[in-house]
Amino acid sequence: MGNAVVKGRASDVQTLEQLNRGYVHAGQTSDTGWFDKHLAACFMASNPDGSLVDRAGFLERIGRPNPSKNMAPVDTRVRIVGDIGVVDSGFQYTKPDNQDGAGHYTDVYGFIEGRWQCVSAHFALRPAPPQTGGAKTADVVSGAPNAVDHAALWDLNHHYIRAVRESDVCWFDSNLAAEFVNGNADGTFSDRAAFLAFIAKPIAVSNLREEDVRIQVVRDIGIIHARTAYTKPDGQAGAGRYTDIWWRAAGQWRCVSAHVTRG
């Protein structure tokens, strides 16, 4: 039994690695057919400019020629938690002006109807561009939660931001899965221990709050897309976007992945 589980997990990791390569290639070649096959109905994507698009909006954008070239994933890491597959990766590419470019992303897959389907993508560039698309958002058209799940995830999301604001390590210690990884605004990724150590330090910004919260639930997968607003140390207004992924096991939601963009 143990060997079967290990082989099954290894096979799933290989499948997700193949899907990641296919995703990057399809994005480079504007292959909407690939995405139409592999994106879940509930799919939503967070873009570098702070905008949020649903599946239809994403396919429309992918259908346009990509001005960048030579896109390739770098230091890709795949992990599986229950029916969630998470792909964290950096990437490099050539800009239209032939300069080198870099970024990072977190793509999340759910094992739905017998196969892995992408339910969420959070895509960021380095350095981060201004969040000019922050007001462009998408409504939840698939995966709308029932009232109980919506209330539970809404509360968890609110306290997540509060705990960041107040450096509340205990809250995170109680609500993060052991496999948790955070995608940071600077392009690095932090495991659970590193994230908790970061949270323990006083936050550099003030008045941090969540806005435009979108919550989806697919079976035991909770997906939260939202914006942040805050005041920078120099007094200027700041904005960002985040995607948090929650997994429900034994009746409890725990956060398995977070990705943060700040402009």
Q: What do the PLM-derived regions correspond to, one by one?
A:
Residues 2-37, 42-174, 179-263:
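A beta-strand edge to alpha-helix "cap/lid" segment located at domain peripheries
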